[in-house]
């Protein structure tokens, strides 16, 4: 207890050591640091540029929605009040508007599953090979229109949370997509056939692909015309000969008047 009472505290030792100068440490004089604006102001050179921004709207941001830097008063302008839905005027729409074609039924948002399932099978490539270009063009846009109707019905069903008709719509969409796939297949076949025909025409001397004259000039055209003329002359000669042969018996059957004897000569002639 006596030793502890005579031992100085750590705080007292610190004060003693700071108050008594150490013989090993040199004596230096330090100036007091001030945090006032006058002492902390940076030195300004004559050639230094002024980077001060004089914009009155500095700090306002439309992205961060910081708003204006001062309050604005709009008490002098009356603010608009929302109108209840039941008091809004009725909007007149065109009954024959083209956007109605996106709905299968104008009275119902989505048809029932039995009505959605009423559709035929898809067209096959064999059936479409016999169709013209115009028919394939019309059928393609009919399929595109049907797919737009299906997409509109699916969006309305998901928005309303009806929960029915998804499987039927998927089957209907698959049938339409299969038809469009067959149309593409047929058009690809026709394109390949056209390419092969162009390659053959480039080597054919009777075909001219320059576009400066007739596209097809057969080499045996003159031969056919000469043969037809020769056949026509032969037929005309044969017809003339037949007419002459038919005229000869008629000429022999009618005797001339000079060769017929008179009645007196016939009586004078003695009978044997």
UniProtKB/Swiss-Prot annotation:
Residue pairs linked by disulfide bridges in the UniProt entry: none
Cellular component terms per the entry's GO annotation: mitochondrial large ribosomal subunit
GO molecular function: structural constituent of ribosome
Keyword Mitochondrion: yes
Entry-linked Gene3D superfamilies: 6.10.330.20
Biased composition (Polar residues): 260-272
This protein's record includes keyword Ribosomal protein: yes
BP terms from Gene Ontology: mitochondrial translation
Keywords associated with the record: Mitochondrion, Ribonucleoprotein, Ribosomal protein, Transit peptide
Comp. bias intervals (Low complexity): 17-29, 227-238, 249-259
Chain residue ranges for the region called Disordered: 1-29, 56-87, 227-272
Pfam family, one: MRP-L47
Protein localization: Mitochondrion
Predominant subcellular localization, coarse grouping: mitochondrion
Organism domain of life: Eukaryota
Oligomer status and interactors: Component of the mitochondrial large ribosomal subunit. Mature mitochondrial ribosomes consist of a small (37S) and a large (54S) subunit. The 37S subunit contains at least 33 different proteins and 1 molecule of RNA (15S). The 54S subunit contains at least 45 different proteins and 1 molecule of RNA (21S).
Family: Belongs to the universal ribosomal protein uL29 family.
Name of this chain's protein: Large ribosomal subunit protein uL29m
Protein source organism: Chaetomium globosum (strain ATCC 6205 / CBS 148.51 / DSM 1962 / NBRC 6347 / NRRL 1970)
Gene name of the record: MRPL4
């Amino acid at each position: 207890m006596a030793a502890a009472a005579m031992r100085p505290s750590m705080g007292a030792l610190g004060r003693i050591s700071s108050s008594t100068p150490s013989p090993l440490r040199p004596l230096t004089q330090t100036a007091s640091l001030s945090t006032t604006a006058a002492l902390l102001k940076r030195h300004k050179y004559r050639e230094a540029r002024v980077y001060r921004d004089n914009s009155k709207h500095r700090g306002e941001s439309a992205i961060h929605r910081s708003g204006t830097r001062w309050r604005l008063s709009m008490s002098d302008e009356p603010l608009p009040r929302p109108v209840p839905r039941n008091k809004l005027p009725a909007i007149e729409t065109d009954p024959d508007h083209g956007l109605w074609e996106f709905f299968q039924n104008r009275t119902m948002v989505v048809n029932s599953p039995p009505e959605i399932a009423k559709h035929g099978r898809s067209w096959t490539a064999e059936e479409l090979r016999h169709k013209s270009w115009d028919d394939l063009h019309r059928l393609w846009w009919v399929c595109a229109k049907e797919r737009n109707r299906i997409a509109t019905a699916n969006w309305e069903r998901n928005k309303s949370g009806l929960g029915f008709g998804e499987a039927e719509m998927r089957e209907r969409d698959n049938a339409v997509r299969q038809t469009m796939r067959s149309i593409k297949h047929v058009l690809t076949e026709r394109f390949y056939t056209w390419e092969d025909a162009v390659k053959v025409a480039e080597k054919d001397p009777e075909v001219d692909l320059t576009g400066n004259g007739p596209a097809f000039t057969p080499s045996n055209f003159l031969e056919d015309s000469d043969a037809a003329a020769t056949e026509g002359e032969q037929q005309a000669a044969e017809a003339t000969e037949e007419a002459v042969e038919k005229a000869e018996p008629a000429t022999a059957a009618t005797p001339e008047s000079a060769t017929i004897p008179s009645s007196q000569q016939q009586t004078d002639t003695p009978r044997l």
